[in-house]
From Swiss-Prot:
Binding site for heme b b562: H75, H174
A GO term for molecular function: metal ion binding
Subunit text: The cytochrome bc1 complex contains 3 respiratory subunits (MT-CYB, CYC1 and UQCRFS1), 2 core proteins (UQCRC1 and UQCRC2) and probably 6 low-molecular weight proteins.
Protein name: Cytochrome b
Source organism per UniProt: Casarea dussumieri
Function: Component of the ubiquinol-cytochrome c reductase complex (complex III or cytochrome b-c1 complex) that is part of the mitochondrial respiratory chain. The b-c1 complex mediates electron transfer from ubiquinol to cytochrome c. Contributes to the generation of a proton gradient across the mitochondrial membrane that is then used for ATP synthesis.
Alphabetical keyword list: Electron transport, Heme, Iron, Membrane, Metal-binding, Mitochondrion, Mitochondrion inner membrane, Respiratory chain, Transmembrane, Transmembrane helix, Transport, Ubiquinone
Miscellaneous information on this protein: Heme 1 (or BL or b562) is low-potential and absorbs at about 562 nm, and heme 2 (or BH or b566) is high-potential and absorbs at about 566 nm.
Length: 371
């Protein structure tokens, strides 16, 4: 397709005039995905998926490969930025009622699950202490599945313990899943433009729209510049800020770390898992903490789409955000009082948002009718 057709297509794409900066994070996620695929490819060229050589190959990339340190740090910090952007993107969808576009919301949730799986497999690849033990703890949750659990776990591991076959298949999955993410992203964008973007007021934008290019392209470029600046500053000045000190030691199955935890972007789900003192219950809560956002389009009872004019729902929304942060913080702490009590309370409040949302919507409808 000639370039001028692509420019015309973007130029003629009608977008609401009043969409705010919160709508920029979709394009930020696309930029993060391109960055991750590019840096990931160059890292995969030098990486060795072998339990004896994986840790050494990471050191080789960092020390001997030209600009290998930059690719590795950019890839690791890029993953954190990816999750920051996706969590903001989801929060915006919850606040402004974007979930009412059901097909887009469902494809987006599928994308989130695929992204989380990809990031989890990537965290295992350096074969450090925390990589090994996080893989052991999380994959071991499959044994909680009644009847099939043990067989599923052995099938996933490729043996009776995490070993060479596990690392090889995790590397294969980590390499192939980003291409599935690209396909799902294309579907997500296609489904979005079938109906069009929402706006902060939650009203129909058909009467007041402007071309995507040049207005929104420049707006997106501004945030993209800020994102890249933040990424490069972190990569060059604080490259290990997101790393766990335990992961600088090679995986040792005979020594258990004092406190096993995954990367920060999984801590909210891990905190919910840990707060339930039952293996099956914890595993179900972990899955529910992510899948529950799929229920949002079906539990929306408010006559107004956005939370802009719904103060009660706003209060619950910001409670959800602070709860998310509280669970993330509590999950970094040891399994002992008062952290367990904090995790359990915060987990209850987290799920309460999704249960109370339809009730609050109904109450707000009643209040609006009386005014």
């Amino acid at each position: 397709m000639p370039h001028h057709y692509i420019l015309t297509m973007f130029g003629l794409l009608p977008v609401a005039t009043n969409i705010s900066t919160w709508w920029n994070f979709g394009s930020m996620l696309l930029s993060c995905l391109m960055l991750q695929v590019t840096t990931g490819f160059f890292l995969a060229v030098h990486y060795t998926a072998n339990t004896n050589l994986a840790f050494s190959s990471i050191i080789h990339i960092m020390r001997d490969v030209p600009y290998g340190w930059m690719m590795q740090n950019t890839h690791a910090i890029g993953a954190s930025l990816f999750f920051i952007c996706i969590y903001i993107h989801i929060a915006r969808g919850l606040y402004y009622g974007s979930y009412l576009n059901k097909k887009t919301w469902m494809s987006g949730t599928t994308l989130l699950i695929t992204l989380m799986a990809t990031a989890f497999f990537g965290y295992i690849l350096p074969w450090g202490q925390m990589s090994f033990w996080a893989a052991t703890v999380i994959t071991n949750l499959l044994t909680a599945v009644p009847y099939l659990g043990t067989s599923l776990t052995i099938w996933l591991w490729g043996g009776f313990a995490i070993n060479d076959p596990t690392l090889t298949r995790f590397f294969a999955l980590h390499f192939i899943l980003p291409f599935i993410i690209i396909s799902l992203s294309s579907l997500h964008i296609l489904l979005l433009h079938e109906e069009g973007s929402s706006n902060p007021l939650g009203t129909n934008s058909d009467t007041d729209k402007i071309p995507f290019h040049p207005y929104h392209t420049y707006k997106d470029l501004l945030l993209l510049t800020l994102l890249l600046t933040l990424l490069l500053l972190t990569t060059f000045f604080l490259p290990n800020i997101m790393n766990d000190p335990e992961n600088f030691s090679k995986a040792n199955p005979l020594v258990t770390p004092q406190h096993i935890k995954p990367e920060w972007y999984f801590l909210f789900a891990y905190g919910i898992l840990r707060s339930i003192p039952n293996k099956l219950g914890g595993a179900l809560a972990l899955v529910a903490s992510i899948l529950i956002i799929m229920t949002m389009p079906f539990t929306h009872t408010a006559h107004v789409r956005s939370m802009t004019f719904r103060p009660m729902s706003q209060l619950m929304f910001w409670t959800l955000i602070s709860t998310f942060m509280t669970i993330t913080w509590a999950a970094t702490k040891p399994v002992e009082p008062p952290f367990m009590m904090i995790s359990q309370t915060a987990s209850m409040i987290y799920f309460m948002f999704f249960i109370s949302n339809p009730i609050l919507g109904w109450m707000e409808n009643k209040i609006m009718k009386t005014m």
